[in-house]
């Protein structure tokens, strides 16, 4: 994935400066690739160290839920901005094979492994109190 010009904090840096907004839940809506717009908000909330006691996500918003809860601002950006350039992401090739336009197995299973295109930090996710 491409590096973004702005430095995003590591999950550890983000957790160290976390501010929790009590009595408020954060819900990420679905919307497929429209969530590329929301990715900037997710990254900014993480960079500012803002946390919520409850976080939920629906459909594509569940990707934001995972990235926000694991405090991975860079992954939040890459999931909806850079990943679309990956040939395995989807397209007509996958659609013609009867798998749908998006390669869901790749997007939601394969990329998150430690050696995948966008490794997921499960330890940071599980350590988040939300």
Q: Language-model features: where?
A:
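Short, glycine/charge-rich beta-strand/loop segments that flank catalytic centers
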Residues: 95-99, 125-130
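A generic secondary-structure signal marking the coil-to-beta-strand transition
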Residues: 22-24, 129-130
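Patatin-like phospholipase
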Residues: 23-24, 32-115
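Small-residue-rich anion-binding loops in enzyme active sites
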Residues: 1-23
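A short alpha-helix-loop-beta-strand transition element characteristic
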Residues: 114-129
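A generic local structural motif
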Residues: 12-14, 42-43, 118-121
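Structural motif
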Residues: 16-18, 47, 124-125
């Amino acid at each position: 994935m491409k590096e973004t010009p702005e430095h995003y904090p590591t999950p550890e840096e983000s957790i160290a400066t976390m501010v929790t907004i009590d009595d408020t839940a954060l819900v990420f809506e679905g919307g497929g690739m429209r969530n590329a717009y929301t990715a900037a908000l997710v990254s900014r909330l993480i960079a500012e160290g803002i946390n919520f006691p409850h976080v939920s996500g629906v459909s594509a918003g569940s990707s934001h839920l995972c990235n926000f809860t694991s405090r991975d601002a860079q992954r939040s950006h890459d999931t909806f901005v850079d990943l679309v350039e990956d040939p395995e992401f989807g397209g007509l090739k996958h659609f013609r094979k009867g798998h749908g336009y998006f390669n869901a197995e790749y997007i939601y299973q394969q990329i998150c492994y430690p050696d995948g295109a966008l490794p997921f930090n499960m330890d940071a996710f599980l350590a988040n109190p939300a």
